[in-house]
From Swiss-Prot:
One of its GO terms (cellular component) is NuA4 histone acetyltransferase complex. PANTHER family: CHROMATIN MODIFICATION-RELATED PROTEIN MEAF6. Its main location: nucleus. Component of the NuA4 histone acetyltransferase complex which is involved in transcriptional activation of selected genes principally by acetylation of nucleosomal histone H4 and H2A. The NuA4 complex is also involved in DNA repair. This is Chromatin modification-related protein eaf6. Residues 20-49 form a coiled coil. Residues 99-187 are annotated as: Disordered. The gene is eaf6. Component of the NuA4 histone acetyltransferase complex. InterPro entries: Eaf6. It comes from Neurospora crassa (strain ATCC 24698 / 74-OR23-1A / CBS 708.71 / DSM 1257 / FGSC 987).
């Protein structure tokens, strides 16, 4: 039977492997330093893109290439005030969101203290609907909620017609809009 242990190395072969190991280790350190440098440059570039994008979106409240020029053509003056109230949405950040590696939330997390527990270790929330294990839940299911609404409209129409109370829902359905004649007569 064949021996799978591989070639036997003597003391001389082991001594020759140490310089090769040290050379590879030094090469690995250089590559890791190069990777860190590239990551820093990439982060700086992505931050620059984010800042320029923010500046562009804030300086063009009436209309821009991303949100469209509807407000620009309408000439509305309330757009800037509305933008300040709502803020810039991430959906408009086309360029900074296109990067796979850019994550502004990771930068905010790195600034928070490390004593906080990560989200994956948070306790599982307990729903109150599971507390009643003996009987049925009082929470409506999607089918029971929609089925009840369909029947309730018929009930409302019947009760409002019988009681004489005018309801705005049934009132608008019962009255028909009169046809306006502008002089043209159909024959």
């Amino acid at each position: 039977m064949m021996d799978n242990s591989g070639p036997k190395m003597g003391a001389a072969d082991g001594a020759a492997g140490i310089p090769y190991y040290e050379k590879q280790r030094q090469h690995l350190k250089e590559l890791l330093n190069k990777k860190k440098l590239l990551e820093k440059r990439l982060l700086a570039q992505e931050e620059s893109i984010y800042q320029k994008e923010t500046e562009y979106l804030e300086n063009t409240p009436a209309g821009n290439i991303i949100t469209g020029f509807d407000n620009y053509t309408k000439g509305t003056a309330n757009v800037a005030a509305q933008r300040r109230k709502t803020g810039l949405t991430d959906a408009n950040r086309v360029f900074s969101r296109s990067s796979i590696s850019y994550n502004p939330a990771a930068q905010q997390d790195s600034q928070t203290p490390a004593s906080s527990a990560p989200a994956s270790h948070a306790p599982t929330p307990v729903s109150t609907s599971f507390n009643n294990k003996d009987g049925a839940s009082s929470a409506p299911t999607p089918t029971s909620a929609t089925a009840g609404k369909a029947n309730s409209k018929k009930k409302k129409a019947a009760t409002s017609g019988g009681a004489g109370v005018e309801d705005s829902e049934t009132d608008s359905r019962e009255t028909k809009k009169a046809r306006t004649n502008f002089g043209a007569v159909r024959k």
